[in-house]
Amino acid sequence: MKVILIKDTKDGKANTIIDVSPGYATNFLFKNKLAEPLNSRTEKLLVKRKQQIEIEKQEKQEQIAKLKIEIEKLVLWFKLKGNKESVHGAITAKKIKKELEIKGIFVDKQAIQTSGISTFGTSFVDIKLSSQTIAKLKINITKDE
């Protein structure tokens, strides 16, 4: 019996057509609302769902690309105390996230890939926006008088 999976299961991912035994389909998949039987109506719905998912995926990629451009144009300025050789403190992912939020850019703290910047001058921090997209944020650290 052919069914369309509604949710991810051990048999496959959501929105895929699989072939299972009638008993398994009736007693487990349909009962737990994990699948629906394949017919002309559900097949049309599947095509529409896949198109909608593809559109949403493209829109998300466009948003990520715009966000990457916006982040790479940005320069964050921080002041740290210290003398010529040593710096007291560090710029952490938490501080970077806070500054980005002030500028209107919201990213997850775990996306900011830094272990803390503790040197004066210019540094670059990677911000992982997706599995394939990484933006480089420019950070300038000056001496606080």
Curated annotation (Swiss-Prot):
The protein's superkingdom reads Bacteria
Which cysteines are cross-linked by disulfides?
none
Question: Which UniProt keyword terms apply here?
Answer: Ribonucleoprotein, Ribosomal protein, RNA-binding, rRNA-binding
**Pfam families in UniProt:** Ribosomal_L9_C, Ribosomal_L9_N
| Cross-referenced NCBIfam families | L9
Q: Name one GO biological process term.
A: translation
Instruction: Please report the name of this protein according to its UniProt entry.
Output: Large ribosomal subunit protein bL9
- Which parts form a coiled-coil structure per UniProt? none
